[in-house]
Amino acid sequence: MKKEIGGYFELEDFGGKEYYPNLYKVNLGRTALRWLLEGRGYTKIYLPVFLCESVTEACEQRGIRISRYQLDAELNVLLPRKKLGESECLYLVNYYGQLTDEKILAYQKIFGNIIVDHTHAFFQKPLPGVDTLYSCRKFLGVSDGAYLSTDAELEPEKKPLDHSMGRKIGRAHV
């Protein structure tokens, strides 16, 4: 383990090895989300009420309609159990590792289009056919970085930019 510096870990050197070498690599989780929303052509997303503002902002920047859903005491989705429309998706956050692979697959079977946010479950591997986002900063001593697992056809030249220094000097708007 690295030596702590003022409550933070120093930046890590991984010797050029990626934890998820076969996934898309982007600078931030919200960048991965915007890229995925564009690639899938979603026009509406169901977001939990307990959520980081940056996710909401990323959806708004893409012009995605947002509908909020409640969670029960065990962080289960409280929505009518039905397939979503082709251009709609459900955003699932794995807050404390409560989303097992079985539960994720059950949500996919019920709702169809889902996006799993493993920001707080970095080491839980992505499932085939399930769009999954990871943010490296929550678990690793890196300044930025995120992974995206998807089988969607994504166009690299359309990758949205995200100016992460906006966190330091106020919000940067893309």
Predicted features, each with a name:
Residues 116, 123-126:
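Intramembrane catalytic core of multi-pass membrane enzymes that act on lipidic substrates
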Residues 86, 128-129:
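Alpha-helix C-terminal capping/helix-to-coil transition sites in glycosyltransferase folds
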Residues 172-174:
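Conserved small/polar residues in nucleotide/adenosyl-binding loops
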Residues 129-168:
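Active-site PLP attachment segment
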Residues 116-118, 136:
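A cross-domain feature marking catalytic cores of carbohydrate-active enzymes
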Residues 5-19, 23, 27, 31-109, ...:
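PLP-dependent aminotransferase-like
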